[in-house]
């Protein structure tokens, strides 16, 4: 990767970013029509429930897209302010928020040798894993309501348990 052309690397990052938002949009648009998932909240009563559905879903998708772009921009600036080049900041912000984890270097984040950059990546990968519908509806104005959401609580519980198990088994493996 260190020798790969920058055009290829940024293209790969852009595709990862578009895939991240694309899967969210597809889930919001397609699944309700198939009556799959918890998206029945968009179902409005009437003769044809989908007459009013598309304007509402368009509004929700727009909000989610704004949140996705805002998080990407915040991440870009945080990476840049903590020592990444403009190119690396852009590419890594695309791949972090989409949780793809692609890097522009052979050693991935170890290349930067910067714990702050690594912590930023961890935080934003967790944020990128959260339900964007909830993030868009809250506008990040009420963090308490986000944390009180049952999906997010379960996700964070599973995350904490997984990290604890990995730590326990890795520690036992290393210690012998």
Question: Where are each of the predicted segments found?
Answer:
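Membrane-proximal intracellular helices of multi-pass ion channels
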Residues: 1-176
